Amino acid sequence: MVLSIRSQIIIGVVSSILLTSTILAIAYILMWFNGHMTLTLTLTTIITSCLTLLICSIFINPLIQKIKQFNIKTKQFANGNYASNDKTFNSPKEIYELNQSFNKMASEITQQMNQIKSEQQEKTELIQNLAHDLKTPLASIISYSEGLRDGIITKDHEIKESYDILIKQANRLSTLFDDMTHIITLNTGKTYPPELIQLDQLLVSILQPYEQRIKHENRTLEVNFCSEIDAFYQYRTPLERILTNLLDNALKFSNVGSRIDINISENKDQDTIDIAISDEGIGIIPELQERIFERTFRVENSRNTKTGGSGLGLYIANELAQQNNAKISVSSDIDVGTTMTVTLHKLDITS
């Protein structure tokens, strides 16, 4: 049987009183007091001890009540009621400090739970959006494939157009799966080794796959180095992905025949390199510029399949930048264009 604190204290006090009274009674007898005096002293001792017990109970009772309140609060917390956070918990110092520590723990757990719920909601919306985005290219691929198989599409120009659409939708699927792969790996703590980067060579390797598209869309793309930049150490893999996503974004949200500029500058005092990708696209209104890197946000403020992709490119780029010693900033004017600037901090591999 587990005794309550009240019972243990009372038993302790009563035992102490009985022991003290017994010892005093024996002492009175040994002192050769007469019977009347011995009885008087013994009764006085017992009465005094009872008063002590009463006073002790008066002081102990509020403490017991506070402990009961604290026990109720911990049970509520254990049952998922994280809002039961009594800030006006008056009690002795030790119990007060215990309550403050509990409140702090409850507050932190509540914040973590809210964050988990928010992230779970975002993930649910993300999966729903991606599932919807996957249906469109899949339906298109199935439709045109069946048309080619069943002989419905027979004219040469229609066949060529169908193949072009199939390739386009297959590329779109590839982009969607690529985005999903990066979303999954973003929060796994994966690290990349620093590599020596020659920036002009890196840009050539990034821009080469876009050569045919730029020619086909009659675009102008210029790369400008403000000064000669020596090779430096950075995380190559995430940097390639960041620049690719920003370039994709510039191409998606600007018109065919428009201009794309990539300007590179170096700040030797801060040991940083800025890579600015500018387009002549639709632009972003100021109140939305802070939100464009959110996981569930798209510039059009709707899931417009016209631009293709999942709308996750900027989110992925920003997350990779934050995780790999870089930063992305944005400046934009409506119907003028947008500039995305990646600020790279050179890595000191000797430290």
UniProtKB/Swiss-Prot annotation:
Entry keyword set: ATP-binding, Cell membrane, Kinase, Membrane, Nucleotide-binding, Phosphoprotein, Transferase, Transmembrane, Transmembrane helix, Two-component regulatory system, Virulence
S-S bonds: none
Modifications after synthesis and translation: Autophosphorylated.
Entry's Gene Ontology cellular component terms: plasma membrane
CDD domains given in the database record: HATPase, HisKA
Bilayer disposition of the protein: Multi-pass membrane protein
GO molecular function: ATP binding; phosphoprotein phosphatase activity; phosphorelay sensor kinase activity
Record-annotated membrane-spanning stretches: 9-29, 40-60
Modified residue annotations for Phosphohistidine: H132
SMART domains assigned to the protein according to its UniProt record, in alphabetical order: HATPase_c, HisKA
Catalytic activity field: ATP + protein L-histidine = ADP + protein N-phospho-L-histidine
GO BP terms in the entry: cellular response to phosphate starvation
Function field: Member of the two-component regulatory system SaeR/SaeS involved in the regulation of staphylococcal virulence factors in a strain-dependent fashion. Probably functions as a membrane-associated protein kinase that upon sensing the appropriate signal, autophosphorylates and in turn activates the cytosolic response regulator SaeR.
Name assigned to this protein: Histidine protein kinase SaeS
Species in which this protein is naturally found: Staphylococcus aureus (strain bovine RF122 / ET3-1)
